[in-house]
């Protein structure tokens, strides 16, 4: 039955977009199309990746973990359905769930570690008031089953029928605010209720609400590690969401529910998931018509009578700074009750953002995958500056800057590989904003070092490495960095000496291999920065540390091996290089061991020479399952291998890069819910596809080289700023013609298998002749 419902939903999505796609699928020749002629957003399917299902993924990490709701490019607000609180369901939604518990105004995209946000949960209901959410397939509450065939998602828009209440819900968003439209049945006891304590992966620990006038409420939701959230509290996430919400129907019969949390009660994720939590919240105290209320677990509701198909709307602005900021955000963006106008503006914002890459050729399915991938790369790092320029600093104080937009959610270990190098091409100002955000965070917090996984000013310590240094070095090498570089270098230097190979020439267990190799790479980044800034002594110091990867290599085992602090290798496992977690983070040595992007010649020499390395790579790919789900070989579901297909370009066999990059594009990405083989990871999984489908990829951020591979499309036009366009034209490109026969750059024969960033950014045309068999003479110089 579930498969049939899914098929019907997919057919419905295809039917509703086929006319738009037909208009988009014009010939590749002719003048460049304008945004007015084309709705790039019609190619976006937000259901791609929108599942946390571990069974379908074949691994505990689950699938894409994206959300299907409404948002805008890099917007603060995401108005999205939530189907679950708790577990490792960071987006708050999973497609196979059969009930919805409400529509939140903040979400995270594609993450594990239990997630966070999911604040300001709004739910329309009818009948008796229920103050507990209930459980999927279990305890009853205010949640509702929903009609799967009615579910619709587009860029900036979401719609569904809540079948238990027979209420149609629609959502749209602006950058700092959002709007919900509910179509009610005839009922004397209709209602909109807001669960102010709700939070993905936990609970808000304190809330306040006040009635401003007969259409308006405002309040705040304080979230601390004591309430779980990011890493179930281990991520040190501490933030306050302020909201300013208005109802189209006047507040007459309204109230607050409050739950008395027992003194000393642990409020982490396990408590929120427990039956005791449902019992406690179901027995909440009701206070009628209070002007203001504060407490540890609150909700607000307004009741009214509705006629048949009566529309009732709610709009809200949020802020991480103040109530006044939330009010300004709403009033600046949504001035009236015209839902369709807000939706239209959201669509227009997406059309403009997505127009930065215009592809032609390929199939409609491939275009949907491409533009949905591009869409997913434009969710984070999101804005957390209010419309008046204020942002919450890492010192807990409001700040204002005229020189940058404060941004948040930096999933560093993931996004330094593809997402940030992609943005240096299509959104370089955003990369600069991110670096300024991380630098001011280091300054305001007093820590004066860079965080590796930032969420709303939290030094979460999630994952490993020093990815902010990679982004900094990459941006500086590309000439797009407008920081105080002396300050930035000082913070980067401190970061490298706090977390690196300084003390022993390697980093001991746990995760000795992953840490040593990742730190060696960012120590190379430091050497490049130091050299560029004229710090020759530092450059030599870090260049030596960048060779630390050699200190873990065991030639007898033909493998990197983790060392203990006393210098001894950890015992060799029975599974050898395939043993997951053997000195590695979420992977094995076969996968992590290729991560020496800054010294590929040195790595090749260490591993026995070019022929042996090519043979090892060939074996790895040949043993990889064609569905690319979690596996012990080329595991595309996890980031450490994302550069590996492009290593062939460095080994004199670029045709194998062309073969495998194209094959991965075809097999690991699909236009369906299960269309991402692993977590989206805040844009990284999708950025890989965008770059590879364009025929480009950066093996070593910090170096300005982009590998040339096999484009998916016949023509790709990238807007690179200052009125420049870089075009990648793949003549005779078909599913069979995946190999480059020859190339021209701006009309001149081009024999290299890579481009420089500057070649791309000054605009021009890379013209590739494609064929069905490898040309083993092209690109080997």
List where the protein language model places each region.
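Bacterial N-terminal signal peptides
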Residues: 14-25
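Accessory carbohydrate-recognition regions in carbohydrate-active enzymes
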Residues: 33-470, 476-517, 530-551, 557-558, ...
